[in-house]
Amino acid sequence: MNFESASYKTKDAPDLNDFDWLDPFKLSDLLEEHEVLIKESAASFANDVLMPKVVEGFAGEEVCPEIFSEMGKMGLLGITIPEQYGGLGANYVSYGLVAQEIERIDSGYRSMLSVQSSLVMYPIYA
């Protein structure tokens, strides 16, 4: 059924002009300043560093292990680990935002980020 069908009147159709398809629940409005900064840093890394290497790797059917060193230098690995142990001491919302930005470019690298941060680094810290 569509909005042009007889079951819907024009006045009853939702206004999708104001709908934000990238943030339908407007969750970005709930983020704290430090979470926004971490998200923006991760997005910048994903666009400027990760994307070109993913495109190049896809063409050559290769994985670029150097990306992990670069993620580490950016502080994207183990961000929930306290600063005194080498992490950023960020919350899990920030961790999710970083994962979302990396996932936006490539799910394989996001999986590797998650394994390194959650299954390797966190158990060593804990």
Question: What is the predicted role of each segment?
Answer:
Residues 1-34:
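Intrinsic disorder at enzyme termini
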Residues 7-9, 34-40, 105-107:
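A ubiquitous short alpha-helical element
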Residues 9-11, 26, 39, 53, ...:
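Context-gated lysine
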Residues 28-29, 36, 61, 88:
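Helix-turn-helix-type domain boundary/helix-start signal
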Residues 29-50:
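Mature N-terminal segment immediately following signal peptide/propeptide cleavage
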Residues 44, 49-126:
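Glycine-rich flavin
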